[in-house]
């Protein structure tokens, strides 16, 4: 496993570019934020105490109330000709009654139904984490790659490998699994995209 590209040390910033955030601090102005607040209360976003840095998203109380984030500026063009790597660590309080997404997407107010991106997603009503590679609303779906649990951290990663025409994904540092890059979104700049939607009131 140590020879897999996605487990290599971080590359030099002189030959690569990227975005890194441990959420020791948070500036809402860096993000395009989309919320729905039909239930009681309001969506909130705040730093919270926790080793390594933690960012807490709290939705309003209604079914389908949500809070989604797109990093401003679409800075990542994934053509498949160069290596690209993404990783994130997160948890959800209710692993069943929720929809969430984490990955790279175009800026969209509906990231659960986006047209272009490479991302991890979970649907309401189950605990199955899925991995999606999507271009122009046509996707390669790899379903049920992991079972989410309430209030339990998960680490997800993907690596675009130009040498094999594959996109590799990994959960909790397990052996990477490769999927075809047929639907790699190579004609759109992408950005960091994540968020959560309530599955019940």
Specify the residue positions occupied by each region the protein language model found:
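Extracellular glycan-recognition surfaces and repeat-rich motifs
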Residues: 29-56
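Beta-strand-rich interaction surfaces with strong enrichment in secreted/lumenal proteins
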Residues: 71-78, 141-148, 180-182
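Localized edge beta-strand/strand-to-loop motifs within extracellular or lumenal beta-rich domains
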Residues: 152-167
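Short strand-turn-strand beta-turns centered on an Asx-Gly dipeptide
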Residues: 171-175
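Flexible glycan-contacting loops in extracellular carbohydrate-active proteins
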Residues: 179-201
């Amino acid at each position: 496993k140590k020879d897999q590209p996605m487990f290599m040390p971080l590359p030099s910033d002189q030959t690569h570019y990227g975005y890194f955030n441990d959420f020791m601090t948070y500036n809402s102005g860096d993000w395009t934020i989309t919320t729905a607040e039909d239930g009681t209360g309001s969506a909130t976003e705040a730093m919270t105490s926790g080793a390594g840095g933690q960012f807490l998203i709290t939705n309003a109380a209604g079914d389908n109330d949500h809070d989604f984030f797109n990093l401003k500026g679409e800075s990542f063009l994934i053509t498949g000709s160069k290596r690209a790597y993404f990783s994130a660590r997160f948890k959800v309080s209710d692993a069943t009654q929720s929809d969430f997404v984490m990955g790279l997407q175009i800026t969209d107010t509906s990231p659960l139904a986006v047209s272009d991106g490479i991302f991890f997603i979970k649907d309401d009503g189950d605990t199955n984490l899925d991995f999606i590679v999507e271009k122009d609303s046509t996707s390669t779906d790899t379903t049920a790659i992991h079972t989410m649990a309430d209030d339990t951290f998960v680490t997800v990663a993907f690596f675009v490998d130009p040498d094999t025409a594959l996109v590799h994904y990994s959960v909790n540092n397990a052996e990477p699994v490769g999927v075809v890059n047929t639907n790699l979104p190579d004609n759109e700049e992408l950005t960091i995209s994540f968020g959560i939607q309530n599955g019940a009131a």
